[in-house]
């Protein structure tokens, strides 16, 4: 079985004597014969998904990295000569390429890119890296698609070297020469470095620390391969959208390995779900005790930094300066992940009892059958190059929209699918490149209320304004770059998405919306990084049955997915039930295991909860509320609690039918919001008749438009948001989205 990266030193075969982690292990039990059999079955199940790379491809990567390393050494010698360094220094000046990320961890998949770091001595400037080294790469015949992103948060050179995509960061150390045996984990290397170099070094330092903090690297790698595949298949692998990225999943698996140091992969996968389905967030996950290096770098510490108290699911990197790798997680994304952990525990319980096979764990749930209501975001650009830039910007802001939606008092959950899809063209005769994302919505059951309106117009419009402004400020914006949103019922999704994505071959009514058909073959789900999610599929052509992690099946009454300006959609609220997964049924007596929480910070009283008023007039925000998030359960042990995040306030932005939509709206404290009430399923148990009224704000007449014509017709000038830089004198046209849902009892 291939393990694609050489390990750091030999791994001990005897049960480890060293203590790993910040708590004692839960169990030191050695693997049984049945565990070995299950592990082999796990390996066989993983193979069709392409998670293992062939030895030939591995050697090709090693050869390419060797060539790149030689180029770096040659380039640094040339720079040294041009700066008139002594010959004795030039001969030993060194320079080296380090790797990090999935390749360094040894868990990269077939065709995955390589994250690399170029380390240079003190006399080599960053400007040299982006000029002379860039020019040197350009001369290499194996190098294609060379591009520099010098102004990025972490500056990078991207290239394709002999068919392998590589991202190269740069760090200049305060050393005269770079020795071959340099250990980047040495904190003293960070002294006198600029912040860009520290950021560039962070990836390597974190990856190397993780590998040094696990008892057995091979067991860690196989377990991480399985968990990463599971996360991708279940649409919860995306740091940028508020789920977890590769390094976060690696740290969760590493913590599991520390708690069960002698266990092998089959056991570790099960224990992973056991530990994190019971974890008392927001207690942080730590692989080692944080160390202070007195370098005055900002580190994650909720005792010192009030903003750190808002983090809902902290997973702390082990290398200084310690950071929370999951600061993007929201109430909704955490709830989705916790429910998936519980479902994973239930499935692995069955596997250990020989009631199910490993393939069941990797069955993909059908996101498009899970919810009754969806928001579809569409981004379009006139060229493919512009589309790539535009899509990257829009995707990086979607989590802000999700955070805004979940603060609506009538929205229980806003679940974004990390996959993006090609969208039908607005004008078949016009060259246009379009991408869409889908957000599933769950509405709370309304009590003793009638005709409550859920107005999402402000949230959508402020989101589009934010995206446009950043595009303008970064000089990325082009005239034909557009973004729009629409409310879509589940029954209408087939007109936006191809059948093989929906996984449901059922005849649907086409009444209400007509969209250009999508070409199934145009779907591209091959992107694989922390921020762009891919969904590996087994090489066999067998179709997996959708695994609905929450067992939901919603109603199918169908409105038009696009609504006219100032239109109102009437829906009935459905009761939200909480699916409970009985994690105490885990095999091997695991139900009685106490999961040690890793928080060591003393409890701190959070600052007073804000009561913020805001005035909404179309899209103008006055006195914007601070970013906040929903409350989460903390550990019962007061000595190990961290400050509870400030409870997210719910917007009462949905006036009664008779109220004016422009009426002043206030935010109220939601002191009793319980994350456990955010259910993913059970909507159909109280499913009632739904009716759709589409009425304009002036004529009250029913109007149905096609999605394409809607996007062309709803364009107005965007107004200003007080917390965002103003638009230029001639504001660009922004698609106005009026999405109002009326909840009827």
UniProtKB/Swiss-Prot annotation:
It catalyses: RNA(n) + ATP = RNA(n)-3'-adenine ribonucleotide + diphosphate. There is a cross-link at residues 444-445, 506-507, 736, 740 (Glycyl lysine isopeptide (Lys-Gly) (interchain with G-Cter in SUMO)). This is Poly(A) polymerase alpha. Residues 508-643 are annotated as: Ser/Thr-rich. GO terms for molecular function: ATP binding; magnesium ion binding; manganese ion binding; poly(A) RNA polymerase activity; RNA binding. The modification Phosphoserine is found at residues 10, 24, 537, 558, 738. Polymerase that creates the 3'-poly(A) tail of mRNA's. Also required for the endoribonucleolytic cleavage reaction at some polyadenylation sites. May acquire specificity through interaction with a cleavage and polyadenylation specificity factor (CPSF) at its C-terminus. Polysumoylated. Varying sumoylation depending on tissue- and cell-type. Highly sumoylated in bladder and NIH 3T3 cells. Sumoylation is required for nuclear localization and enhances PAP stability. Desumoylated by SENP1. Inhibits polymerase activity. Belongs to the poly(A) polymerase family. Monomer. Found in a complex with CPSF1, FIP1L1 and PAPOLA. Interacts with AHCYL1 and FIP1L1; the interaction with AHCYL1 seems to increase interaction with FIP1L1. Interacts with NUDT21; the interaction is diminished by acetylation. Interacts with KPNB1; the interaction promotes PAP nuclear import and is inhibited by acetylation of PAP. The record marks 153, 158, 328, 399, 524 as: Interaction with RNA. A motif (Nuclear localization signal 1) lies at residues 490-507. The gene is PAPOLA. It is found in: Cytoplasm; Nucleus. It comes from Homo sapiens (Human). Mg(2+) 1 binds at residues 113, 115. Residues 1-17, 523-534, 583-594, 611-640, 694-704 have a biased composition (Low complexity). Its EC number is 2.7.7.19.
């Amino acid at each position: 079985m291939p393990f694609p990266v050489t390990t750091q030193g030999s791994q001990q075969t005897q049960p480890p004597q060293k203590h790993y982690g910040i708590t004692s292990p839960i169990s030191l039990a050695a693997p049984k014969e049945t565990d070995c059999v299950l592990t082999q079955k796990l390996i066989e199940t993983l193979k069709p998904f392409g998670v293992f790379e062939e030895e030939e491809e591995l050697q090709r990567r090693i050869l390419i990295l060797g060539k790149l390393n030689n180029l770096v050494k040659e380039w640094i010698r040339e720079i040294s000569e041009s700066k008139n360094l002594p010959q004795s220094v030039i001969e030993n000046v060194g320079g080296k390429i380090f790797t990090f990320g999935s390749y360094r961890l040894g868990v990269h998949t077939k065709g995955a890119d390589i994250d690399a770091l170029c380390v240079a001595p003190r006399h080599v400037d960053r400007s040299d890296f982006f000029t002379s080294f860039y020019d040197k790469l350009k001369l290499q015949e194996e190098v294609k698609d060379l591009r520099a992103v010098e102004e990025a948060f972490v500056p990078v050179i991207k290239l394709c070297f002999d068919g392998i995509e590589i991202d190269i960061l740069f760090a200049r150390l305060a050393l005269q020469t770079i020795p071959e045996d340099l250990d980047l984990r040495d904190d003293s290397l960070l002294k006198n470095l600029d912040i860009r170099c520290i950021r560039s070094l962070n990836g390597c330092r974190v990856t190397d620390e993780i590998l040094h903090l696990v008892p057995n690297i091979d067991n860690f790698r196989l377990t991480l391969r399985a968990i990463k595949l599971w996360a991708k298949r279940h649409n919860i692998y995306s740091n940028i959208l508020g789920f977890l990225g590769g390094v976060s999943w690696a740290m969760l698996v590493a913590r599991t390995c520390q708690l069960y140091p002698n266990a092998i992969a089959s056991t570790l996968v099960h224990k992973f779900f056991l530990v994190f389905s019971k974890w008392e967030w927001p207690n942080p996950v730590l692989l080692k005790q944080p160390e202070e290096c007195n370098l005055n770098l900002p580190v994650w510490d909720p005792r010192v930094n009030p903003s750190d108290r808002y983090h809902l699911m902290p997973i702390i990197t082990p290398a200084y300066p310690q950071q929370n790798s999951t600061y993007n997680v929201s109430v909704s994304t955490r709830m989705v992940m916790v429910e998936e952990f519980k479902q994973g525990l239930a499935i692995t319980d069955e596997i250990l009892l020989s009631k199910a096979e490993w393939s069941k764990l990797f069955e993909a749930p059908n996101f498009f059958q899970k919810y009754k209501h969806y928001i579809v975001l569409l981004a379009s650009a006139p060229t493919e190059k512009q589309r790539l830039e535009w899509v990257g910007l829009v995707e990086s802001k979607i989590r802000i929209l999700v955070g805004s939606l979940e603060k609506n008092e009538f929205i229980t959950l806003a679940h974004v699918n990390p996959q993006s899809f090609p969208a039908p063209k607005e004008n078949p005769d016009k060259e246009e490149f379009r991408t869409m994302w889908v957000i599933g919505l769950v509405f709370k059951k309304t009590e003793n209320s009638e005709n409550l309106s859920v107005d999402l117009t402000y949230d959508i419009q402020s989101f589009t304004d934010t995206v446009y402004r950043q595009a303008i400020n970064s000089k990325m914006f082009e005239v034909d770059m557009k973004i729009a949103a629409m409310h879509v019922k589940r029954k209408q999704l087939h007109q936006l998405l191809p059948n093989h994505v929906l996984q449901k071959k059922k005849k649907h009514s086409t009444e209400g919306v007509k969209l250009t058909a999508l070409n199934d073959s145009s779907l591209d789900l091959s992107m694989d990084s922390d921020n762009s999610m891919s969904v590996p599929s087994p090489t066999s052509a067998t179709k997996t049955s959708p695994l609905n992690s929450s067992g939901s099946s919603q109603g199918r009454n169908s409105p038009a997915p696009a609504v006219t300006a100032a239109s109102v959609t009437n829906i009935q609220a459905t009761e939200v039930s909480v699916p409970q997964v009985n994690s105490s049924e885990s095999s091997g007596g695991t139900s009685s295991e106490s999961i040690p929480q890793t928080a060591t910070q003393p409890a701190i009283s959070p600052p007073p909860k804000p009561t913020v008023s805001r005035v909404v007039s179309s899209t103008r925000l006055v006195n914007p509320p601070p970013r906040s998030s929903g409350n989460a359960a903390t550990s019962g042990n007061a000595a190990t609690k961290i400050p509870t995040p400030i409870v997210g306030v719910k917007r009462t932005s949905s006036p009664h039918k008779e109220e004016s939509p422009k009426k002043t709206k206030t935010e109220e404290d939601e002191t009793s919001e319980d994350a456990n009430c955010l259910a993913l399923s059970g909507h159909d148990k109280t499913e009632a008749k739904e009716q759709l009224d589409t009425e304009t704000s002036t004529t009250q007449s029913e109007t149905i438009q096609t999605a394409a014509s809607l996007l062309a017709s709803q364009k107005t000038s965007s107004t200003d948001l007080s917390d965002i830089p103003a638009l230029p004198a001639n504001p660009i046209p922004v698609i106005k989205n009026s999405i109002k849902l009326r909840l009827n009892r």
